Amino acid sequence: MSRPSIEESKQELSSSPNDSVMGKDPAPEEEMQYPSGFALSVIMAGLLAAIFLISLDTTIVSTAIPRITDEFHTVADIGWYGSAFFLTLASFQGTWGKIYRYFPLKLSFLAAVLLFEVGSLICAVAKNSVTLIVGRAIAGIGAAGISSGSYTILAFSVHPRRRAAMTGAIGASFAVAAVAGPLIGGAFTSHTTWRWCFWINLPIGGVSAGLIAIFFKAPPQARAKDVPYKEILLQMDPSGIVLLLGAILCFLLALQWGGSAKAWGNADVVGTLVGFGLLLIAFAINELWLQEKAMIPPRLFKGQTILFSSLFTFFFSGSFYLLLYYLPTYFQSVKGASASDSGVRTLPLVLGDGLFATLSGAVLGIIGYYMPLLTLGGVLTTVASGLLYTLDLDSGANAWIGYQAMAGIGIGLAIQVPMMASQAVVRVEDLSTVSAIVLFFQCMGGAIFVQAGQAAFTNKLVQEVQRHLPNISAARVTSTGATELQSEFHGHELQVILEAYVAGLKDAFIVAIVLAGIATLLSFGSGWRSVKSKKEEPKAQP
């Protein structure tokens, strides 16, 4: 997820919260009664906990996945553990934006936290892989509401003069959680159980919800818009959500089945691919028909910056999340590291991302032009992904530390720039909408391409096992957890299977290389513009 940007803070300073978020007529800032002192501190603590929670959940599971595959006896669902969360996180961004506009702000936020907690609870008690995936999907729906709701509550709680600083604090919370996630997940998995990666969400979410419930008092300007329920339903774009979810699920199922569980020419695989195409066309027609009521208002894509920023973040975030989810598998299955050790070993990637994402925001504020950061970040990530492709059974620490550091720097330089660039070229009334659009493409990239990496990994793994160990069932290998290989296989068999794992991971990293390369090319389409330029994107239709 994109961190809150400098430009977003500047935009907020120039508008009343209800103007851009709640859909009401602008009210003078002096009429707003903002909390202060202890009340404000407690509200901010609740919001920081909420954002920490969401950021933590995007990364904490990465180092736990190999151990999860041990318990559920399959490596075929690795991609779904990330994709299910990102898919619903992306698809319900616009829906929650409408919910906060038409329903009471505090109750809506608490409902989002409750939904996230229910999803986390399902994950924590899951007895099989399917239940875990369902829990991740439910948690993603709640996470979408928490992320947008947190910034809405902040806008109604903090005076514009202090809002930029508070937004920066939320960004810091996000970055800390993103770095801590793999470490915490690895520690839980090694010393207790991977289920604590989800149990931990319950007390943190409870504290956040309790603080907001007690201390946040929604001002009159935050009152829900009085609109008939039929109109509210239309504004939610339920048809768009159903069509989009159906299309992406068809595509993900085709990736999961094709080449491993079923042949690519199998009727089920072909049928899901055809269904994906038809549903995607229907979704596009639906969005064009609904216009301003659509999940993704088409008029905003008439501008070069928003179009190419969205496409860039779609491919670029896919590359990032693919590396984040599959490097722990390399460390734990191939190198024999524990879950906690693999969390430490991914620090060059996540630390580089966190540090240079902060730096890129400062640099962009100085130079103004965003294309150089997009291009440089894309080039570094492409090269680093290519270097990670060379990792083998005997690769040393110097290699994986240096390659990850380069990837982290490249990702950090560019990952939040599309959000800042898009926010800089729209008017205040479109700020929340364009933010949701960029976040949608970022999360959708994670959902689709983590699963694409899974397909590449599994297909290659099965092919290598069938080629070199014809007497061993490929299903036996894929049903063996990633960290159980050493105990399940021995001698020559183990050596061949580890080499097959490396070959599968290399194919997954090829996907990351291609995605980062496409993003680099797209960076040139964003245009040589400065975030300090006058806004020129299409104006909202009346």
Curated annotation (Swiss-Prot):
Where mainly located? Answer: membrane
From start to end residue, where is composition biased (Basic and acidic residues)?
1-11
Q: Which residues cross the membrane?
A: 36-56, 72-92, 105-125, 138-158, 168-188, 196-216, 241-261, 269-289, 306-326, 347-367, 371-391, 400-420, 437-457, 508-528
Keyword Transcription found: no
* Topology relative to the membrane: Multi-pass membrane protein
Q: Kindly list every residue the record annotates as glycosylated.
A: N18, N471
One of its Pfam families is: MFS_1
* UniProt xrefs under CDD domains: MFS_Azr1_MDR_like
Reported phenotype of the disruption mutant: Increases the susceptibility to gliotoxin. Leads to complete deficient gliotoxin secretion but still retains the ability to efflux bisdethiobis(methylthio)gliotoxin (BmGT). Leads to increased survival of infected mice.
- Which Gene Ontology molecular-function terms are recorded? toxin transmembrane transporter activity; transmembrane transporter activity
Q: Which InterPro entries match?
A: MFS, MFS_dom, MFS_trans_sf
* Record-linked Gene3D superfamilies: MFS general substrate transporter like domains, Multidrug resistance protein D
Q: What induces it?
A: Expression is also under the control of the gipA transcription factor.
Listed under GO cellular component are:
plasma membrane
Q: Which domain of life is it from?
A: Eukaryota
Q: Which UniProt keywords apply?
A: Cell membrane, Glycoprotein, Membrane, Transmembrane, Transmembrane helix, Transport, Virulence
Subcellular location, record wording: Cell membrane
Q: Where is this region: Disordered?
A: 1-30
Q: Which family does it belong to?
A: Belongs to the major facilitator superfamily.
Q: Which function does this protein serve?
A: Efflux pump that provides the dual role of gliotoxin export and self-protection by allowing the fungus to evade the harmful effect of its own gliotoxin production. Moreover, it also contributes to the virulence through gliotoxin secretion.
Q: What is this protein called?
A: MFS gliotoxin efflux transporter gliA
Native organism is Aspergillus fumigatus (strain ATCC MYA-4609 / CBS 101355 / FGSC A1100 / Af293)
